[in-house]
Amino acid sequence: ADATAPGYTFSGWSREDGFTMPAENVTITGSFTANGETHYKVEHYQQNLEDDGYTLAETENLTGETDTTATANPKTYTGFAFDGTAEGTVASGNIAGDGSLVLKLYYTRNSYDVTYAYTGTVPTGASALPEKATVKYGAPVTVAEAATAPGYTFSGWSRNDFTMPAENVTITGSFTANSNTEYTVRHHFQNILDDAYDADTAMLSETLSGTTDTLTAAAAK
């Protein structure tokens, strides 16, 4: 019977079956040739969002020559970076004839910045901008509450709640001056006994409205 070895092809024996024994010793030889399409796998693991563990993202089923060294090639994944130092990494190995070689590569999840900014004129008394946040790729982001400023209407932030992309995000908002901001005009009358004006009595008060942070002038009665 022919000899066998996992991942190899046997050449066959050098003599056919059933030969007649000559008057001398006989050595029958055979050889093995490594198969060129022996199977092995490369597994690609991505870091979890919730913790520092990893989840299998992709498996490559590849072939190569038995008992030669296979080296895994890192792939490009949006929002992830290859980490050649991650625990459990098997970047290269001998292609076993039985197809049992499994190479393993790990990719850490990138983090990006979420920044808030006002555009246009920022009125006095405007809410402080939310602090910059560093967020992992794929994480849910809750946008801050609307900003406020006395006498102004806020446009709203430029984004609603979103899933963190593989890039920094700047969220903007602006203020518009209200046109119905109230102000008061007080008309004071001279005292009957002297030339003074009493701030608390003999006064006519008007409540008017106008655009915040614009100049106005009182009209005499």
Protein language model regions, located:
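Secondary-structure capping and domain/repeat boundary segments
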Residues: 1-221
